[in-house]
C-alpha cells in the first residue's frame, strides 16, 4: 500500500540548461528533511519531454542512488510507447519499485489507442505502475472504465495520480481505492479536501520548496483536522497561487533556486518568471520557516 506525500521533483539545471546534479543532491536533502514519502523524477514538474532518453535514464539512476531510502516513483511517460517501454525496463533493471505513466500526448489517442499504450508499457516490466491522469497537459482523459480495466487485467497497476483538478471525477474514482490500489491527489490546493474523502496522499509540487505539504499531511493523519485545514488555506494555497502566476513550471524552479541560493537555469523554451512574478513569489517565500 502506498501513501503519504510524493514530490514531483523539479529537474535542477545550470545556467547552460544542463542538469545540475549537485543542486539535485541539495533538493533530495531538503526533501528528506521535509519528510516526504516518495520522489517522482521525470514527471511534468520535472519537464520530462525536454530531455533525451539517455538524460532521463541518467537522472533516474542518480535519484535512485541518492534517494536516502525514500521510495522512487520513476516517470516513464512519453509520446512514444517504445521509449516508455525502454524506460520501464531500465527502472526495473536498476531496482526502482514504481513507475508512473501518463497517456501519449500531442496526437490525441482514443480509448483503444490509450489501452494499447498502457497495456504494452505495463507488461514491459514487473515493477509496480501508477496511472497518471493530467488531461490539461496530455490532452486526454483517462476514463474510469479504463482505470477499472487496467487494474482488473494487471496486478502491478497499484494506483493513480489524478492531476485533473476535477473533484467530481476524483470523488468517483476514490471508490476504487482498496488495499491494492491507491489514489493520490495531484493538485496541491485540493489536498485537504481529497484526504477528507479518503485519498491515499498527494503528489504535490510545493513539497519541492517548503514543508507546508508534509506538515498538512502529518496533521491530518494525526487527526488534527483544523490545523491541517489552516495549513491548506493560510500556507499552501497562497504559495501555490503566487508560484502559478508564472508559466508552469517555471515558478517552482525559481522558488527552489531562490530558497537555496542557487544560480540555476531554465532549459529553452522555458523562461524564468517576470520581475513582477518573482516579487509575488518572494513575498510568500519569506513566510517559510528557515531550516534550523
From Swiss-Prot:
**Which pairs of Cys residues are joined through disulfide bonds in the record?**
none
Q: Supply one GO molecular-function term.
A: 4-hydroxy-tetrahydrodipicolinate synthase activity
Q: What class of enzyme is it?
A: lyase
A single GO CC term for this protein reads: cytoplasm
Quaternary structure (record): Homotetramer.
The organism sits in which domain of life? Archaea
The record's section on Pfam families has: DHDPS (PF00701)
Task: Share an example GO biological-process annotation for this protein.
Answer: small molecule metabolic process
Give the record's family classification.
Belongs to the DapA family.
Where does the UniProt annotation locate this protein? Cytoplasm
| CDD domains (alphabetical) | DHDPS-like (cd00408)
Coiled coil regions, renumbered to chain = none
UniProt protein name: Uncharacterized DapA-like lyase Ta1157
Q: Which UniProt keywords apply?
A: Cytoplasm, Lyase, Schiff base
Q: Cytoplasm: is it a keyword of this entry?
A: yes
Q: Does the keyword Lyase apply?
A: yes
Name the catalytic site residues: 44, 106, 132, 161
User: PROSITE patterns per the record?
Assistant: DHDPS_2
Enzyme Commission number(s) = 4.-.-.-
